[in-house]
Regions:
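Short coil/turn connectors at secondary-structure junctions
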Residues: 1-2, 26-29, 56-58, 79-81, ...
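Conserved active-site segment immediately N-terminal to the catalytic lysine
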Residues: 77-89
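Active-site cofactor/substrate anionic-group-binding motifs, chiefly glycine-
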Residues: 1-14
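Active-site C-terminal subdomain of aminotransferase-like
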Residues: 89-172
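Active-site phosphate-binding strand-loop segment of PLP-dependent enzymes
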Residues: 13-68
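General beta-strand structural signal in soluble alpha/beta enzymes
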Residues: 4-6, 32-33, 61-65, 84-87, ...
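Short, well-ordered, mixed-charge alpha-helical segments that flank or form enzyme active sites
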Residues: 12-16, 38-43, 69-73, 78, ...
């Protein structure tokens, strides 16, 4: 797999104009990026990046939201994000061990055309198993119960209230 990094200074976010220049210079299939980098507190301007990606309709977006999922608004469908990945750790404040994802129909269609997808992270395999009420592998049942508890806490607080609380906490430390 060939990958071309878009280098930025440590702690700086991706400049959407730099991304546009890079995408215009080649034949790209996918853009992957970390939305929020916890080690330095940098958050990429995701909406503006997605605005750029709309100009390149053949490019699929895969966004790591492990430390931003549920704490800032990420309107996946409105912004045209193809794949959101997160984990149970960090923003969901759970032990590590669960991978969570949301996949657009466009990304599913791209996966159908992709040979050698493997098994472990094959979204098509997950979708097929989900349709049968199954999982593709042995699930970590205690973490699924913990996720249910965590999601209920988020819904009880209210998603918008959670976003506002995290924004207030962010302002206290920055």
């Amino acid at each position: 797999i060939q990958a071309d990094p878009l280098q930025v200074e440590w702690g700086q976010h991706i400049d959407p104009d730099d991304l546009k220049t890079q995408l215009a210079s080649g034949d790209y299939d996918v853009v992957t990026l970390v939305h929020n980098e916890t080690s330095c507190g940098m958050m990429n301007p995701l909406k503006e990046i997605m605005d750029v990606l709309r100009e390149f309709p053949d490019v699929i977006s895969i966004i790591d939201t492990v430390s931003s999922f549920s704490v800032v608004p990420i309107p996946k469908d409105d912004w045209g994000i193809d794949v959101i990945l997160t984990g149970s750790q960090k923003a969901l404040a759970m032990p590590p061990g669960l991978a969570l994802f949301s996949v657009s129909e466009r990304a599913f269609q791209r996966a159908v055309q992709t040979e050698g997808r493997g098994y472990y992270f094959d979204f098509l395999e997950f979708r097929s198993n989900h349709a049968k009420g199954m999982t593709p592998s042995t699930p970590v049942i205690p973490l699924i119960h913990a996720l249910n508890y965590t999601l209920n806490k988020i819904f009880d607080e209210g998603v918008e209230n959670r976003h506002q609380r995290h924004s207030r906490l962010n302002q206290l430390v920055h």
